[in-house]
Amino acid sequence: MNLIEIETYLANASFALLLITMLIYGMKAIFTKNNILQLFGTLGILFSNFLVALLLSIRWFDSHHFPLSNMYESLMFLCWCFTFFHLLIEKYIQINFIGFITVPIAMLVNAFATFFLPLDMQHSTPLVPALKSNWLIMHVTIMMASYAALILGSLLSIAFLFLTYNKQIELQGNSIGNINDEMNSYITIDIEFQKNESIELAKLIDNLSYRTIGIGFPLLTIGIISGAVWANDAWGSYWSWDPKETWALITWIIFAIYLHTRITKGWQGRRPAIVAFIGFVIVWVCYLGVNLLGQGLHSYGWFTK
């Protein structure tokens, strides 16, 4: 068995584990007090994380460069980031429902990379000259981690919008504080919804969304700055309005607006969630859309023909 076959096995195994884990979290939604299901779900995420990390490590060993030089590698790294953030949230914040957000998106990203990308795009290729730099590790890893955090935070906001759909609900209070504190007060005209435990879940989702985006935004900022420094080193210009640079700036502006409305204006609930939903679309355009067009300085190394 050669390294390519091992990589294929690891990719398929990680996808299968994520699929099984998603089913486990679905069962957990029915049997809410079953701790065994929760344990199996966490183990599924943990082993999936390990398998993807092993896959990327093998590619690193085989290619002699950090495995973030094409679309397949970046997608698998994004999948790893989703599972990594899941484990962090479960460990330090102890929010079990996060699996309903992280597992499906990690599985879909894994599936797209493993089953939909052409085989020639999955194989590791030599680095183009501009990518032969130590900036590759810092810039690309930070950008991918920021994408993962922003996507997860935006998905939580979308979940909040679904949960509060057709409900007259308003959140009041300060966004800053401990996520486990009862620091927000909720005003709702819908009495049945007020009696439902969903209001507490909505409260938690809104707060967690804010904090996750609060992690992704500084990472995105650092990623853009490091990319500008790398661009100056490689091409002699800090900023050239390349499509990827332009959409990264748009992404930064959208989430800056989100954080500004929450921190300065005191917005909570539906209005910032709508901004985050817009940000969710923009992130995917920045990450996948620009590369699918195959134009600009960032198109090489992702889609080769």
UniProtKB/Swiss-Prot annotation:
<dbReference type="GO" id="GO:0005886">
    <property type="term" value="C:plasma membrane"/>
</dbReference>
<feature type="transmembrane region" description="Helical">
    <location>
        <begin position="36"/>
        <end position="56"/>
    </location>
</feature>
<comment type="similarity">
    <text>Belongs to the CcmF/CycK/Ccl1/NrfE/CcsA family.</text>
</comment>
<protein>
    <recommendedName>
        <fullName>Cytochrome c biogenesis protein CcsA</fullName>
    </recommendedName>
</protein>
<feature type="transmembrane region" description="Helical">
    <location>
        <begin position="142"/>
        <end position="162"/>
    </location>
</feature>
<feature type="transmembrane region" description="Helical">
    <location>
        <begin position="75"/>
        <end position="95"/>
    </location>
</feature>
<keyword id="KW-0472">Membrane</keyword>
<dbReference type="InterPro" id="IPR045062">
    <property type="entry name" value="Cyt_c_biogenesis_CcsA/CcmC"/>
</dbReference>
<feature type="transmembrane region" description="Helical">
    <location>
        <begin position="239"/>
        <end position="259"/>
    </location>
</feature>
<comment type="subunit">
    <text>May interact with Ccs1.</text>
</comment>
<keyword id="KW-0934">Plastid</keyword>
<dbReference type="GO" id="GO:0009535">
    <property type="term" value="C:chloroplast thylakoid membrane"/>
</dbReference>
<dbReference type="GO" id="GO:0017004">
    <property type="term" value="P:cytochrome complex assembly"/>
</dbReference>
<dbReference type="InterPro" id="IPR002541">
    <property type="entry name" value="Cyt_c_assembly"/>
</dbReference>
<feature type="transmembrane region" description="Helical">
    <location>
        <begin position="97"/>
        <end position="117"/>
    </location>
</feature>
<keyword id="KW-0812">Transmembrane</keyword>
<feature type="transmembrane region" description="Helical">
    <location>
        <begin position="273"/>
        <end position="293"/>
    </location>
</feature>
<keyword id="KW-0201">Cytochrome c-type biogenesis</keyword>
<dbReference type="GO" id="GO:0020037">
    <property type="term" value="F:heme binding"/>
</dbReference>
<dbReference type="Pfam" id="PF01578">
    <property type="entry name" value="Cytochrom_C_asm"/>
</dbReference>
<keyword id="KW-1133">Transmembrane helix</keyword>
<keyword id="KW-0150">Chloroplast</keyword>
<dbReference type="InterPro" id="IPR017562">
    <property type="entry name" value="Cyt_c_biogenesis_CcsA"/>
</dbReference>
<keyword id="KW-0793">Thylakoid</keyword>
<feature type="transmembrane region" description="Helical">
    <location>
        <begin position="212"/>
        <end position="232"/>
    </location>
</feature>
<feature type="transmembrane region" description="Helical">
    <location>
        <begin position="11"/>
        <end position="31"/>
    </location>
</feature>
<comment type="function">
    <text>Required during biogenesis of c-type cytochromes (cytochrome c6 and cytochrome f) at the step of heme attachment.</text>
</comment>
